[in-house]
Amino acid sequence: LTAAYTFGESGLTLSVADLWWAGQGRGKYFNFKSHETAHHFEAGLAYTLPVEKFPLSIAWYTMFAGMDKKLNDKGEEKQNYSSYVEFNYPFSLKSVDLNVTCGIVPYKAARQYNCNGFAVTNVALKGTTAIRLTDKFSLPVFAQAIWNPRMEDAHLVFGITLRP
């Protein structure tokens, strides 16, 4: 669940998200107690550079409450404030809209991102185009290759977009 607000044409977006990663049948969804919940509450700030020929966007997300914990020197569980930073660069080639993504974990976030320090955790390329089916209808399709070098994990995602 995400709530976001974009500040006019400034390129700045502020967001707050409630992320649920426990999985089906694990944890109680409506339990929001700090040391029991499976929710992660995250604040985000995104900015797109106001340069038409270089529309790079930069986003920083930090978990500020919920399950994102670490043990301090006394062995007490404390909020970890795990963060993720993402850079996106959109561009087009012929009739295909492309987006290159690079995501990093800037510092230790062992429990959430399995990182003991700075790590590249997301490298992706997404392509979107429309397949013309009739004179009046085109089907928007996309394909995305995603790689997490830190986890040595890769995914291919394909999809369609239906609009009224």
Which residues does each predicted region cover?
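Outer-membrane pore/translocation modules
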Residues: 1-86, 113-118
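Short loop/turn motifs that connect adjacent beta-strands in outer-membrane beta-barrel proteins
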Residues: 6-13, 50-56, 90-99, 128-141
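Transmembrane beta-barrel strands of outer-membrane/channel proteins
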Residues: 14-18, 58-62, 100-104, 141-147
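Structural signature of outer-membrane beta-barrel domains
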Residues: 19-23, 63-67, 105-109, 146-150, ...
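A C-terminal functional module that forms or caps the active site or interfaces directly
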Residues: 85-88, 99-101, 105-128
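Surface-exposed beta-loop-beta
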Residues: 114-116, 142-157
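Short, solvent-exposed linear motifs at loop/edge-of-secondary-structure regions
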Residues: 119-136, 149-151
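Outer-membrane beta-barrel "beta-signal"
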Residues: 125, 152-164
